[in-house]
Each structure stands twice: as structure tokens, then as C-alpha cells.
């Protein structure tokens, strides 16, 4: 279980008012905010914090979201892709979006190029 704390008293003055996530199962501490010595998001053994007094800080995990829509936008003409299929040497830098990734059109197989052409351009909505 992970617990959020703010250190209110410590022999190490660099820890005063710092905020940490303490993972008791792994015996680790992740720094969220510290005035000195520790960097944000730094993970250290919990024993490195030494003796301290603290107050609990509420932790809220974001709700998981499922579903949604994905849209790839390629701004070009159908004729450009058709010409790139016929004359790839004229379009060495032509980059398109496929499933959220940028890819060089010429690196796709002929079947993939035709699939992109079919999916990208429609007659109507």
C-alpha cells in the first residue's frame, strides 16, 4: 500500500515540509516535493529518510477511462498518394499518420499503401 506523507519534523532539515509517497511493501520512498537535496520523482530506500514525524497527505488516483475515439488526420490529396504509389522516388519524405504513429508512406508495403488510400478517402460521410 502506498501512503502520502508530509514530513513535519526531522533531524535532516532538507526533509522539512517535503512530500513523499511511501511504498511499505517495497520499503521505498518517492519524492514529490523537497526544498533541497532530493529531486522530484527520485526514489530512495525508506530508511534513507531516517527518523521523522509526518502528517498523512490524501492521495487520489485518477479514475480509469475506457473507450473513446481515435482520429488520424492526414492533410493531402488523394492524387498525391496515388502518385506516391506509382513514383515513390518523388516522395522520399512523405509522412502519414497510421494508428497514432507517424510513418513514411514509402516504407509501407503495397497492400498497406492501398489500405491507407482506401481508408483515408471516402466519397461521403
Swiss-Prot record:
GO CC, any one term: cytosol
Record PROSITE patterns: GLY_RADICAL_1 (PS00850), GLY_RADICAL_2 (PS51149)
Keyword Flavoprotein: no
Keyword Protein biosynthesis: no
Keyword terms of this UniProt record: Organic radical
Annotated S-S bridges: none
Protein name: Autonomous glycyl radical cofactor
